[in-house]
């Protein structure tokens, strides 16, 4: 084996720098295969001519002896600066120069082993400062003559090198140098970050993320060169036993975020080296601290930058249109599909405008008067957002008398302001809250509704009008039409309106037109029926008809001194029967209304409800329960005896139950039916009174054979 000769004046420098301290037993690669026995001489610039060789092939590039890889040498801060030997003006590159490596292409291990580190010895011809003595100066930190290792990123930066933050910054390094300092890149086999983004470089949008790691693309895999040393291979196998957790964590993060991270965006985040050192010390130091710090940095980047950029990109791509405020007839655009964010404070929702069907000139209605027949057309989509929540009480059928009314409904005129001769048209029974109106009025009224519906106060007022079923929308529009119909409707209203409307409409009204409902002067005595009709009534039905007669005359609420509050919601009402006001102390409630508005009952025993009496302001503890009844239920309100006695309720009177929309409590009110003036309640007819009445009727109707036949039947039944 040949030995390595070094000039005397450069020997100390080589020994100090650890460059030429190799083992003589190892093989030295020469520039020529046939000149194996030549001695290797390094050029000495100190001036000793005996050691200067004038031939070009005496310059040696690198030697792979493990002993020359000294770990204390400074490192280059940037990977592009590490390159293989190149030719210079003074000493060209030798022919067939071979650079050896101490690693394999499939290994990734720690850099703590000096024998497994990468090193490149640059020739003296690459010195960026000409005419400088490399081997005689004694400065081992000169990057032109030192072995550089990429495994350690601890570098003494000075302003002349131009590395760091900007041009010449000294204390700020980029993120790749940061991860190198954290021993993230200390393996012999660097992973190629550009391979992760190889498919996304051309199509990735750089605006998809905010800030990621800087200069990841510059970390190109250093070409692995063929290793001819068996000893170095054994050292590599021993280093494979240590798993690099930091590299695995970082690589996993890159793979998970490769959809949103492009190679061009990995240049933006910079962290000072002093910050990394301080954070590592606070976390306890060592490799575990570096691993924890790496996870924190990656989590911070992903949470505060990647998601923020995604949110910004998403919001910029969405275009919002202002709320639909203009008249639909001025902008009949059938493709109004812009996204409008939903809002609870507005009564408008995104919908596609559809031209309305032809106007129905023969139909004018009101939100409160929904019991009038409506055309079987689907509601216009532009009106649907204006609708309030549907009424909680179920609508009755559109034909026939209402369930709680005992009077048939005569036909109504086309523009009748009363809608129903009984004075009640239902609680918004019309599913279309804003129905069809004449074309001349539709635009003005729609604009009025659009403006009023946009405020909360308007919604409150509209709900109050629905509860009272009296609205002022069409008062001025229908006055002229209603004046012609008032005279012919007064007789019908006098019979039924006063009896039913106040029961279902607990509203204080005045006779001077405080509301536009007409209250006629009700006669003290009901109209006399023909004698034949009187005699046709069976004796057993007289008691029921007599109890029904006072029901036609009810004291209005204004005479009882009670005014409804705006926050009360009508739930149900019940006309009291004999069993409800008897000694049982319970009132049977309507099944449908009870199931709809009162709390749901799971057990048969029911629940206790605190009912506040509106008239006396007293709270009654009543029990709400049900009885099973042939696969159905009968709902009861028990403990009502004291309430009935206090309010003096009798058969034919009724109760009304409300709920307070603000506090959720229940309120009950007993309404007495006014007895006709000069008329006393009838006592149950006795058998003697029945005989006398039948005898008098027989004397009156002696000249009527048909009447005698009619009267004979109930008389014979009574005797039997």
Curated annotation (Swiss-Prot):
Induction: Repressed by silencing mediated by polycomb group (PcG) protein complex containing EMF1 and EMF2. Keywords: Abscisic acid signaling pathway, Activator, Cytoplasm, Developmental protein, DNA-binding, Nucleus, Transcription, Transcription regulation, Ubl conjugation. It comes from the Eukaryota. Residues 572-674 bind DNA. Pfam families: B3. The gene is ABI3. This is B3 domain-containing transcription factor ABI3. Residues 129-146, 687-700 have a biased composition (Polar residues). Changing residue 231 to E: In strain: cv. Kas-1 and cv. Sorbo. Participates in abscisic acid-regulated gene expression during seed development. Regulates the transcription of SGR1 and SGR2 that are involved in leaf and embryo degreening. Interacts (via C-terminus) with SPK1, SCAR3, ABI5, APRR1, AIP2, AIP3 and AIP4. Binds to BZIP10 and BZIP25 and forms complexes made of ABI3, BZIP53 and BZIP25 or BZIP10. GO terms for molecular function: DNA binding; DNA-binding transcription factor activity; sequence-specific DNA binding. Ubiquitinated by AIP2. Ubiquitination probably leads to its subsequent degradation, thus negatively regulating ABA signaling. Transmembrane segments: none annotated. Residues 122-146, 324-360, 675-720 are annotated as: Disordered.
């Amino acid at each position: 084996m040949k030995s390595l000769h070094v000039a005397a004046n450069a020997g100390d420098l080589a020994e100090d720098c650890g460059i030429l301290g190799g083992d003589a037993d190892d093989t030295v690669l020469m520039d020529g295969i046939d000149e194996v026995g030549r001695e290797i001489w390094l050029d000495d610039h100190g001036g000793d001519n005996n050691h200067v060789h004038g031939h070009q092939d005496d310059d040696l590039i690198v030697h792979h002896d493990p002993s020359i890889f000294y770990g204390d040498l400074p490192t280059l801060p940037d990977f592009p600066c590490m390159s293989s030997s190149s030719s210079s003006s003074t000493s060209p590159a030798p022919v067939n120069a071979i650079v050896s490596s101490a690693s394999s292409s499939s290994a990734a291990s720690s850099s703590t082993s000096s024998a497994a580190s990468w090193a490149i010895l640059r020739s003296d011809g690459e010195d960026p400062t000409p005419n400088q003595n490399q081997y005689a100066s004694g400065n081992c930190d000169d990057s032109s003559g030192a072995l550089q290792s990429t495994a350690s990123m601890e570098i003494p930066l000075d302003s002349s090198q131009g590395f760091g933050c900007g041009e010449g910054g000294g204390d700020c390094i980029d993120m790749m140098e940061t991860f190198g300092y954290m021993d993230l890149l200390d393996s012999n086999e660097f992973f190629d970050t550009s391979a992760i983004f190889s498919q996304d470089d051309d199509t990735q949008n750089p605006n998809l993320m905010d800030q990621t790691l800087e200069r990841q693309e510059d970390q190109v895999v250093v070409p692995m060169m063929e290793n001819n040393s068996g000893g170095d291979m054994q050292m590599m196998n021993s280093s494979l036993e240590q798993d690099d957790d930091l590299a695995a964590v970082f690589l996993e993060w890159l793979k998970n975020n490769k959809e949103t991270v492009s190679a061009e965006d990995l240049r933006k985040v910079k962290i000072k080296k002093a910050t990394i050192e301080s954070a590592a010390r606070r976390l306890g130091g060592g490799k575990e601290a570096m691993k924890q710090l790496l996870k924190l940095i990656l989590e911070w980047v992903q949470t505060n930058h990647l998601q923020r950029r995604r949110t910004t990109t998403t919001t910029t791509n969405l275009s919002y249109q202002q709320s639909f405020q203009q008249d639909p007839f001025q902008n009949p655009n059938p493709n109004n599909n812009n996204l409008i964010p939903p809002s609870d404070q507005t009564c408008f929702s995104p919908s596609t405008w559809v031209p309305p069907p032809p106007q129905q000139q023969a139909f004018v209605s009101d939100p409160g008067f929904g019991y009038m027949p409506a055309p079987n057309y689907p509601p216009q989509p532009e009106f649907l957002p204006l609708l309030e929540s549907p009424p909680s009480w179920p609508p009755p059928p559109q034909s026939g008398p209402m369930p709680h009314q005992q009077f048939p409904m005569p036909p109504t005129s086309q523009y009748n302001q009363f809608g129903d001769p009984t004075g009640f048209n239902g609680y918004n029974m019309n599913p279309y809250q804003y129905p069809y109106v004449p074309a001349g009025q539709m635009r003005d009224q729609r604009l009025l509704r659009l403006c009023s519906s946009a405020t909360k106060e308007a919604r409150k007022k509209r709900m109050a009008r629905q509860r009272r079923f009296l609205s002022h929308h069409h008062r001025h529009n229908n006055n002229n039409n209603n004046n012609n119909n008032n005279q012919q409707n007064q007789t019908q209203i006098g019979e039924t309106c006063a009896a039913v409307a106040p029961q279902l409409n607990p509203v204080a009204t005045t006779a001077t037109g405080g509301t536009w409902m007409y209250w006629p002067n009700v006669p003290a005595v009901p109209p006399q029926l023909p004698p034949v009709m009187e005699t046709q009534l069976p004796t057993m039905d007289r008691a029921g008809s007599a109890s029904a007669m006072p029901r036609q005359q009810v004291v209005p609420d204004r005479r009882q001194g009670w005014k409804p509050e705006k926050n009360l919601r009508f739930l149900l009402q019940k006309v009291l029967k004999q069993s409800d006001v008897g000694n049982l102390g319970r009132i049977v409630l309507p099944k449908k209304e009870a199931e709809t508005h009162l709390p749901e009952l799971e057990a048969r025993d029911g629940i206790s409800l605190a009912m506040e009496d509106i008239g006396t302001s007293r709270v009654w503890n009543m029990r709400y329960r049900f009885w099973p009844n042939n696969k159905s239920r009968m709902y009861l309100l028990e403990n009502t005896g004291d309430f009935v006695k206090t309010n003096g309720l009798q058969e034919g009177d009724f109760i009304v139950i409300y709920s307070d929309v603000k506090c959720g409590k229940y309120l009950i009110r007993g309404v007495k039916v006014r007895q006709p003036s000069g008329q006393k309640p009838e006592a149950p007819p006795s058998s003697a009174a029945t005989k006398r009445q039948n005898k008098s009727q027989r004397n009156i109707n002696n000249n009527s054979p048909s009447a005698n036949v009619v009267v004979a039947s109930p008389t014979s039944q009574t005797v039997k």
